[in-house]
Amino acid sequence: HNTRHDLAKWVDFINAEHPDAVLIAGDIVDFSIQPLLKAGMAAEFRRFNAPVYACLGNHDYYAGEENSERFYREAGIHLLRDTAVAIGKGITLVGRDDRTNTHRKPLNEMMKTVDGTQYTILLDHQPYHLETAERQHVDFQFSGHTHNGQVWPINWIESAIYEKAYGRLTKGETHYYVSSGIGIWGGKFRIGTQSEYVVLTLQ
């Protein structure tokens, strides 16, 4: 439900941070790519001044994975579906397919291809079973999906569903962040929650 005008503002905000990479934890598409195509949204994503990487979310699947993949390509976004890529010196980004795909690769299989000496960032849209990343020695997991409930008091309900429905968490040596995202779903509003982008600084 973000308009092109809204997205343009978010792109400007993020570009002002001078990022080395932009990570998107899925759900760019919501049921159909047609509104995005009509609004010319791909052009806004191409304005990012850094490489953009993403994984698929459940709503991307609802729109049809081939349709969503088409939009990601047109938007210049590197889509990671159960694959890993180097995004900087000593950093590996692992993108999991959404759990909507019941045949996605187990994380332990994916991690066999990752150099254990690299700092590893995992993109996984839905923040279920966070212990999986910890067991595989992932350094940082970034997820979305929950919108932090979007409307109070749904955020309370989500806190009962997920180990972490919003914000930061540390389990062992693995750090997590579940973002409320910049977008909204259903009603075009939030109550008691905020849209956000997250700046991750590695030192």
Model-predicted segments: where are they?
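Soluble catalytic domains of enzymes that build or remodel membrane lipids, polysaccharides, and related
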Residues: 1-203
